[in-house]
Each structure stands twice: as C-alpha cells, then as structure tokens.
Amino acid sequence: MKKILIGGIRLYQKYISRFTPDTCRFYPTCSAYGIEAIQTHGALKGSYLAIRRISKCHPFHKGGLDFVPPKKEKNADSEHSCKAHHHH
C-alpha cells in the first residue's frame, strides 16, 4: 500500500506539479512531506499526516518549515519505568 501511495505522489510530482506555479507555502513541499510521512509512519498515519498538511496549504496560512514528526517508539520508556517500580 505504501508503494502505491508514494507512486501516486511521484506521478503527481512528475506529470502535474511541474506544470503548475510554485504555490506550496511550506518546506518541504506538501508532496515531499507526503512521501516522507508515508515512509516514516506507514500508509494510514502517513496519509493522515499528509492530508492534514495539505489542508493547511492555502493563502490564509503563513506556511513555513513543517517537518514530518519522528516515529515514536512503542512503550520503550513506559515498560522500563513500570518494571523499575515493581518489587518482587
């Protein structure tokens, strides 16, 4: 699924985006953000992040730097702290 979504974004970049004016208000561009979000977080969460970003890309938003958030490690700290508090 990730490959299909990223492939769709790459087709957009190659065949549509290059013929439209540069209007993205963010860095990285929304399409580059979408690819990175899907690569980092998977198809579902990455698509959600990309759609959320695209919804902010309009003339009434100031734009600017907006990077994909890092992937959080699942329960890495919480398991350690829970084990530290149990005394057997």
Curated annotation (Swiss-Prot):
On the tree of life, the source organism's domain of life is Bacteria
**Which locations, inside or outside the cell, does it occupy?**
Cell membrane
Coiled-coil stretches, from where to where? Answer: none
The ranges of region (Disordered) come to 66-88
**Is Transmembrane among this UniProt entry's keywords?**
no
One GO cellular component term noted in the UniProt record for this chain: plasma membrane
The main location class comes to membrane
Q: Keywords on this record?
A: Cell membrane, Membrane
What is the recorded membrane topology of this protein?
Answer: Peripheral membrane protein
Q: Where is the composition biased (Basic and acidic residues)?
A: 69-82
Function, as annotated: Could be involved in insertion of integral membrane proteins into the membrane.
HAMAP family, per database record: UPF0161_YidD
| Family stated for the protein in its record | Belongs to the UPF0161 family.
Name of the featured protein: Putative membrane protein insertion efficiency factor
Q: Which organism's genome codes for this protein?
A: Listeria monocytogenes serotype 4b (strain F2365)
**Species classification:** Bacteria, Bacillati, Bacillota, Bacilli, Bacillales
